[in-house]
């Protein structure tokens, strides 16, 4: 046996006794070994020996169930608890349980919000996306203008296709603008300055800044 293991074994009775008194619940030798092994480096033989020694000295109680022995602290050493104290503890437990449940629910809401925010576009990505959409919208607006001006060269089917595409991109424009607005609002909830200052700091330009109006459907 190594020196450190021997020292741990010598102090095992005190460690085991203190553990059983602090926990004040029944344990098997395997339970005590599993719970103390990592922190104190106790071997199973040392734990079993300490439990038997403490039981023989009357410092802990021992019960045999079939082939298994159960050990627990001597209850005579603890103060008697009144019914009023028990009821008070029950009330405290219920209050703390309700508080924990409320905190857990808040954590779930915050995790859901965080997941939504992390899956959304970043500010630079939004800026790039907005610029691309503006360019794309300008191209289609110009194309539509030319098509309207040259009705003799456009079939009804082509005209209908262009109108459908226009409706599609207008819908996408509204959708992305709404997403951007919601994301900015979520960020602004924890932002110490005004919305205008936030937009100036990150370089966000709105449709209104350029007098751009979303076309009618």
From Swiss-Prot:
Molecular-function annotations in GO: DNA binding domain binding; double-stranded DNA binding; identical protein binding; nuclear estrogen receptor binding; nuclear glucocorticoid receptor binding; nuclear retinoid X receptor binding; nuclear thyroid hormone receptor binding; recombinase activator activity
Region (Interaction with NR3C1 decreased when missing): 118-182
Chief location: nucleus
Coiled-coil portions: 93-153
InterPro entries with a match to the protein in the record: Hop2_WH_dom (IPR010776), LZ3wCH (IPR040661), WH-like_DNA-bd_sf (IPR036388), WH_DNA-bd_sf (IPR036390)
Post-translational modification: Phosphorylated by PKA, PKC and MAPK.
GO terms under biological process: androgen receptor signaling pathway; estrogen receptor signaling pathway; homologous chromosome pairing at meiosis; meiotic joint molecule formation; meiotic strand invasion involved in reciprocal meiotic recombination; positive regulation of DNA-templated transcription; positive regulation of nuclear receptor-mediated glucocorticoid signaling pathway; progesterone receptor signaling pathway
Domain of life: Eukaryota
Location(s) in or outside the cell: Nucleus
Region entry DNA-binding, spans: 118-182
GO cellular component term of the entry, any: DNA recombinase auxiliary factor complex
UniProt region (Interaction with NR3C1, homodimerization and transcriptional activation almost abolished when missing), positions on chain: 89-117
Keywords: Coiled coil, DNA recombination, DNA-binding, Meiosis, Nucleus
Described function: Plays an important role in meiotic recombination. Stimulates DMC1-mediated strand exchange required for pairing homologous chromosomes during meiosis. The complex PSMC3IP/MND1 binds DNA, stimulates the recombinase activity of DMC1 as well as DMC1 D-loop formation from double-strand DNA. This complex stabilizes presynaptic RAD51 and DMC1 filaments formed on single strand DNA to capture double-strand DNA. This complex stimulates both synaptic and presynaptic critical steps in RAD51 and DMC1-promoted homologous pairing.
Subunit structure: Forms a stable heterodimer with MND1. Interacts with PSMC3/TBP1. Interacts with the DNA-binding domain of the nuclear receptors NR3C1/GR, ESR2/ER-beta, THRB and RXRA.
Family statement drawn from the similarity comment of this UniProt entry: Belongs to the HOP2 family.
Protein name as catalogued: Homologous-pairing protein 2 homolog
Source organism of this protein record: Rattus norvegicus (Rat)
UniProt lineage: Eukaryota, Metazoa, Chordata, Craniata, Vertebrata
Gene transcribed to yield this protein: Psmc3ip
């Amino acid at each position: 046996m190594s020196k450190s293991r021997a020292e741990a074994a010598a102090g095992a009775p005190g460690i085991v006794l203190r553990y059983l008194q602090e926990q004040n619940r029944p344990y098997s030798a395997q339970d005590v070994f599993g719970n103390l092994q990592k922190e104190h480096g106790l071997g199973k033989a040392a734990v079993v020996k300490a439990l038997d020694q403490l039981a023989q000295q009357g410092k802990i109680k021992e019960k045999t169930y079939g082939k298994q022995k159960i050990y627990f602290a001597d209850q005579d050493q603890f103060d008697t608890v009144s019914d009023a104290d028990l009821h008070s503890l029950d009330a405290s437990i219920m209050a703390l349980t309700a508080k924990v449940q409320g905190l857990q629910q808040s954590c779930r809401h915050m995790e859901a919000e965080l997941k939504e925010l992390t899956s959304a576009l970043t500010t630079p990505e939004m800026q790039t996306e907005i610029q691309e959409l503006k360019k794309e919208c300008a191209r289609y607006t110009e194309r539509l203008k030319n098509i309207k001006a040259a009705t003799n060269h456009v079939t009804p089917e082509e005209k209908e296709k262009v109108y459908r595409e226009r409706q599609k991109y207008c819908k996408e424009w509204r959708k992305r603008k709404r997403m951007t607005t919601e994301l900015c609002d979520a960020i602004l909830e924890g932002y110490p300055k005004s919305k205008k200052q936030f937009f100036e700091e990150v370089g966000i330009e709105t449709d209104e800044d350029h007098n751009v109006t979303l076309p009618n459907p």
